[in-house]
Amino acid sequence: MNFPLLPVMITDSITDLTPELLQEKGIRLLMLDFDNTIVPYTTSVPTEQMAAWLEWMLSSDVQLCVVSNSRNDRVKIFCKRLGLDCITHAKKPFSKGIRQCLDRYGLKPAECALVGDQIFTDTLGANCAGVRSILVTAIDNHNIWLKLRHVAEKPFIFMARKRRIYFEES
């Protein structure tokens, strides 16, 4: 069993993920963290690159669902505008929102992955739910708390890389 704070996969950006690569790994559903994974905390507008990636992924056989801890309506508005399914109030690292997503899609954890920028919420929640965890670099560290959290996560990223846990090898 892997240590629950180590991501199963690591990549720089969510846009590095392709439908072909995910399907090759047996992933039928990609759960997406919202803040700092798709857009910064300070906006609800995706970059052109992110909007194009989301459109490309939505046209593929890999299903997408935003699973966010946010209670803010901006997540629902964003998802509705782009045609994305979403679950808010997910309570990561607890598995409530992740399990709700699995139930909604009728899939087994092994058929799913969750991509996010935080080890202590996204990675831990995914691993504890049996879903593959994909860690991406945060889009923005706009305040001191985010910077401190990412500093606290560095040893786990180092351990994951030392164990050669990269996306290509998972």
Enumerate the language-model features and the residues they cover.
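Asp-based, Mg2+/Mn2+-dependent phosphohydrolase catalytic module
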Residues: N2-L32, V39, T43-S44, E48-L114, ...
